[in-house]
Amino acid sequence: MCLSRWCIGGVSVSYVLIFMSATSENNKRIAKNTLFLYMRMLLIMGVTLYTSRIVLQVLGVEDFGIYNVVGGIVALLGFISSSMSISIQRFLSYEMGRKNYEKVSRAFSMALQIHGIIAVVVMMLLETAGIYFLRCKMVIPIDRMDSALSVFHCSVLACGFSIVQVPFIALIIAYERMGLYAYIGIVDTMLKLAIAFLLGWIAYDSLALYGGLMLVATIVITLAYVMVCHLSFKEIRYQCIWDTRLFGSLTRFASWSALGEMAWGFTLQGVNIVLNLFFGTVVNAAY
């Protein structure tokens, strides 16, 4: 028997209204987040197409191809952080749903430490095996090898910073702050557009300069993610801990998506490298 004055099927009307209000708020949040993501995607897509055209004009076909294929070597190992990102978002979102912010902090701290280790390992692999492959196997003109090596070193450092970004991006997405995510993505795109214009104004080796400026842009965006998370999510703080059980859970969950991410990465970048081995940098510029 329902004790409330107004009941529908034995359920208090007040509870129904609360549920409807919560559902309405959720729908509004989903719609707003979707709008932010679509705006981000469209703006980034448009600006990137325009930026690529400018960079191609400034660098020339050969240097543009060198940058693409050198960056492709670095990007081959990007599947590791991509697969971990999905795992981190899952654990952060689960603990947030339980309002257990202590465990959210622990999961975030573990994720940050894991990605720090991944960044170091990936950079070491690239600076050893990657350098050998670039020098001995890739088809790059002799007079552009020094510039290609400069781009490679900058790309390796940028890769390390990009890997460290992943836990902060996962935290923003877990909090459903898509506006912040969209704004930082737009700033990143604008920085790359500014770099494209700067290339034509600075009298220096354009290929090496482009690699260095792209590294600076990656560092700036990484710092932006760190500052935004520090200021916006005060209940989440880094803890210097090591939870073996949580480490196992994160890596096991990530292993399910690692194979797909690896296949996708090798499909995109592996073809680029194979094209270079057989046809040279001009074909890489067209790929």
Each language-model region and where it sits:
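Small-residue-rich midsections of specific transmembrane alpha-helices
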Residues: 45-51, 68-96, 112-122, 159-165, ...
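Interhelical loop/hinge segments that connect adjacent transmembrane helices in multipass membrane
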Residues: 12-30, 207-211, 225-269, 273, ...
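Interfacial/gating helices of multi-pass transporter permease domains
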Residues: 55-76, 107, 207-212, 246-257, ...
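Transmembrane-helix boundary and interhelical linker motifs in polytopic inner-membrane proteins
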Residues: 19-29, 59-62, 77-115, 134-140, ...
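Alpha-helical transmembrane segments of multi-pass membrane proteins
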Residues: 128-131, 141-165, 194, 219-220, ...
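Helix-terminus/linker motif at the lipid-water interface of multi-pass membrane proteins
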Residues: 46-64, 135-139, 200-202, 265-287
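Hydrophobic alpha-helical transmembrane segments
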Residues: 182-232, 249-253, 284-287
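Membrane-interface junctions at transmembrane-helix termini in multi-pass inner-membrane proteins
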Residues: 27, 157-187, 208
